[in-house]
């Protein structure tokens, strides 16, 4: 991995009012994460991803891609500032799902991305694997982040991007994505995490 390059990436789940902070790697020109979504009801989930590239060490930032249960989903870039690139994507889930965000597909990167569990029913959130990051979860979105990233301009830019851009044949429109259950090994990992948390509570 490229040493000396340090990006910053935060992920906000707007409808859940959750902040997943510093999901970027310790170093290296790559960023992404895996988010297991647990839900018993159909719902829309809105993600805003704020990337602060290390402009001192790179010329161009890699775009962020997404897969939802293996299906490619377009992630519109809705705003740029001198320091940040802001992406927004809205998905519709009917049951448990796995969302993967990534700038690279090489396993040398993706294997060290962090992994999270977001239970939208119980409103509980866990870090399943921090990977090579200093990531943490805030069970709220701070007022400062709301003022910076949850603006009308970003909302309007997202609406415009969904209306104007032609559908990419290589990526799935969110309304046509059929969701499936988590892979068995992921379910076991999540179950183990839940049992550990229950034991901690009993202790």
From Swiss-Prot:
<dbReference type="GO" id="GO:0016032">
    <property type="term" value="P:viral process"/>
</dbReference>
<comment type="function">
    <text>Plays a role for multiplication of the virus in different cell types.</text>
</comment>
<comment type="similarity">
    <text>Belongs to the poxviridae C7 protein family.</text>
</comment>
<protein>
    <recommendedName>
        <fullName>Probable host range protein 2-3</fullName>
    </recommendedName>
</protein>
<feature type="region of interest" description="Disordered">
    <location>
        <begin position="182"/>
        <end position="203"/>
    </location>
</feature>
<dbReference type="Pfam" id="PF03287">
    <property type="entry name" value="Pox_C7_F8A"/>
</dbReference>
<dbReference type="InterPro" id="IPR004967">
    <property type="entry name" value="Poxvirus_C7/F8A"/>
</dbReference>
